[in-house]
Swiss-Prot record:
Gene3D superfamilies: Probable tRNA pseudouridine synthase domain
Residue stretches of biased makeup (Basic and acidic residues): 100-124, 138-148, 160-182
Places the protein is found: Nucleus, Nucleolus
Organism (species): Encephalitozoon cuniculi (strain GB-M1) (Microsporidian parasite)
Region (Disordered): 98-182
Keywords: Nucleus, Repeat, Ribonucleoprotein, Ribosome biogenesis, RNA-binding, rRNA processing
GO biological process assignments: pseudouridine synthesis; rRNA processing
Gene of this entry: GAR1
SUPFAM superfamilies named among the record's database cross-references: Translation proteins
The protein's name: H/ACA ribonucleoprotein complex subunit GAR1
GO terms of molecular function: RNA binding
Amino acid sequence: MARNFNNRKRLKSTETAELGKILYMCQGQLVIKLAAKDIPYPNSPVLDASSKIIGKVDEILGRIDDVHVTIKPDDQCSISKEGETLFSYADKFIPKKRFLPREETEKKKEEMDRIKPKPKKDQASKGNRPRAFGGKQRGSDRKPDRKWGVIQSNWSKGGRKAESRKDHGSKRPDANRVKPRN
């Protein structure tokens, strides 16, 4: 059953968190030294002190302990002053632990998953299906005592009783011959 999430209203967080302070302007973008403990999502909205959206996060730069962010302003007239603090929505941050190296236990679990042997498919479930390339064909399992061209059933495909090609060992030599029509 498919779910339709388009009708569901998404609640937007109005809680803001400090993003950082403006260092300088470079090629029409603001460069900020990040003051928040987490890293903002790219394209997340950036707010000024009056909670007005002034732009979006464009690029994230620097080391994990010294992060800088560039902001693409919506319009050039709202460019802020150096040293001004900017904000972002609290739910628009990625925890820093996602960017840190994984713990040894997680690495060991992943390695064990790679080493774990995959269960082989049950041979009985395969049956006698013909394979496309080089597999076992249906005719290859015929018993050696059967002869090719021998009709096993007395009923033909048309639904009539067919004559058997087998010699049933009749005592009369003419019994197995087809009699000509007059």
